[in-house]
Amino acid sequence: MVATCLQVVGFVTSFVGWIGIIVTTSTNDWVVTCSYTIPTCRKMDELGSKGLWADCVMATGLYHCKPLVDILILPGYVQACRALMIAASVLGLPAILLLLTVLPCIRMGHEPGVAKYRRAQLAGVLLILLALCAIVATIWFPVCAHREITIVSFGYSLYAGWIGAVMCLVGGCVIVCCSGDAQSFGENRFYYSSGSSSPTHAKSAHV
């Protein structure tokens, strides 16, 4: 029962974290920047934001973004962070699909428990890997951006990335380390049997 609960907790935590990583990858409010001194920017109410895909200017009543489309002149850290965040977002899809197939309520034919266990371990490893990719990108980007322009604060995209990466890391560790062994996955299977009166559900027994 404990292993089953941990599997569900790991899945939910990882799924929410993966959504946070996708939000971070697709938005541009990574860091809030200032082209002048910070007091001047606050007085003029003119701040900017910088992300993986665009540089934006936020003035009174205006919001304008310049897409970063020229790959040849982009700083290396921007391109590297793009690759890391895209990899994290893509790795999340097979990880979540694998976790769906190992949930206690899902059964795929008469497969042994060891098959579910191996899929769960693979999903957990993928989650840990994508979390590490996101952590590296969301730390590397603001550090390098600070060398180019004054950073006023971190944006919501960066916070979403940190939270999402930590949740995926926790979810992956729970799946790999705490969700039971191959035998527990086998014991969590259910079968459907039809009787003369009404259908019943019973837990499979192994000798």
Curated annotation (Swiss-Prot):
Keyword line: Cell junction, Cell membrane, Membrane, Phosphoprotein, Tight junction, Transmembrane, Transmembrane helix
A single GO molecular function term of this UniProt record: identical protein binding
Subcellular location: Cell junction, Tight junction; Cell membrane
Membrane topology, as annotated: Multi-pass membrane protein
GO BP terms in the entry: axon ensheathment; calcium-independent cell-cell adhesion via plasma membrane cell-adhesion molecules; cell adhesion; spermatogenesis; tight junction assembly
PROSITE patterns found in the cross-reference section: CLAUDIN
Subunit structure: Interacts with tetraspanin-3/TSPAN3. Interacts with OCLN.
Job description of the protein: Plays a major role in tight junction-specific obliteration of the intercellular space, through calcium-independent cell-adhesion activity.
Family named by the database record: Belongs to the claudin family.
Identification of the protein by name: Claudin-11
Organism: Mus musculus
Organism taxonomic ancestry: Eukaryota, Metazoa, Chordata, Craniata, Vertebrata
Name of the gene this protein is made from: Cldn11
